[in-house]
Amino acid sequence: MADRRYCCLHDFLSRTDEGREWEDILPVRKWLYQTPEQILIKASNGASDFGNKFGQPLICGSVLTFEHTENNEVYGYDKVIMLAGGVGYGTQRDCLKGTPEAGNKVVVIGGDNYRIGLGGGSVSSVDTGRYSSGIELNAVQRANAEMQKRANNVVRALCEEDVNPVVSIHDHGSAGHVNCLSELVEECGGLIDMSKLPIGDKTLSAKEIIANESQERMGLLIKEEAIEHVRKIAERERAPMYVVGETTGDHRFSFQQADGVRPFDLAVEQMFGSSPKTYMIDKTVERHYEMPEYELPKLHEYLTNVL
């Protein structure tokens, strides 16, 4: 079941009618690229279009708006939030990842690399406009519903087999290959052959190849003896499949070019185990707000305002 949910300020409203006090809690602010109204309309259209192309139409959703000011404090969803996803099921057998061994093959299923979706993890976590427009627009992701459906069909076919040949699996999200594939080899290390990665744009730098985000790709760790079997399933589903590396057992994660140069070469513990710890000290602050004033005879008026 696919759905979408939105959280935003009242700014998504058109404000074509004057004198509606409940829309004027906060002053209308200026927006950098798109207004909340434009985002909700375009995101909704895009989500519905993607679901239809994928073959899983959106059948539910919601919109939540909130803004409040009191005691010189302002609360609200200042940044429009869109949550898109789905609800499915899996077997208990497949709920935990397996343990990788040296020699397991690193496989990528899905589309090519392009100069898009760079820095998405960083940009999505800060105020819009903090970085230059070039950085922010480069971070915009892409998704190809047809390609994602093909990759999904391969994964589903493997899950429905009596013996699932997948040792580990991870989707491509922020940071692209460097994030996805490192998750597969976290316990033992791995070497990725960059010449085996599918390149849609020959002008990409090593950083762009390693870190671009394309959400219709999946990373899998497959036992060597099962590679040809998985390849036949991928061919049946017309899903591009690439064997791009293998686990090494040396506890390093590296990307190596055809000339032997490694633009990315780190110990696994540097990526997962030695990051500075962040300590957050919680302090409970009790706040008291005035009860809203209302008159029961005006119930229908209030409903009309909201609807």
Regions found by a protein language model. Give the residues of each.
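Glycine/proline-enriched, intrinsically flexible loops and inter-domain linkers
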Residues: 1-307
